[in-house]
């Protein structure tokens, strides 16, 4: 795996760490410990990936953007109205920086592949059963 791809994957996984993203780790023995397929990304495993060259074996299971349900599309669209409004000289402005963060956090929390990792071969397509809608906040 190239350094650029490792960087993209690392950045993506950092944002998904709080959301119990399911990852595939190719069966491999490291320091006498067997790592099996389909585990949840945790700080411990994340640390192990950082210290060992395991990036070639790690792939998160993500949902393609086109798998978003109509209800999810509406919820994602409604995030616009959650961004703070600032007023200046009689004009109203939304904080675009906060809006971008809201969108990325929402997409990460629902395990959507908003960076195109599936097409790049850095992630696997999640099955419908992997991430149930009732587990979202």
Q: Model-predicted segments: where are they?
A:
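Structural boundary micro-motifs
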Residues: 1-137
């Amino acid at each position: 795996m190239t350094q650029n791809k490792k960087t993209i994957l690392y950045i993506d996984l950092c944002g998904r760490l709080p959301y119990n993203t399911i990852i595939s780790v190719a069966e491999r023995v490291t320091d006498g410990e067997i790592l099996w397929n389909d585990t949840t990304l945790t700080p411990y495993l994340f640390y192990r990936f950082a210290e060992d060259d395991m990036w070639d074996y790690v792939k998160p299971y993500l949902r393609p953007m086109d798998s978003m349900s109509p209800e999810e599309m509406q919820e994602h669209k409604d995030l616009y109205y959650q961004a703070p409004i600032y007023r200046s000289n009689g004009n109203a402005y939304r904080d675009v920086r906060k809006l971008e963060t809201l969108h990325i956090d929402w997409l990460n929390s629902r395990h959507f592949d908003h960076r195109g990792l599936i097409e790049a071969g850095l992630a696997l397509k999640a099955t419908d059963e992997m991430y149930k809608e009732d587990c979202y906040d």
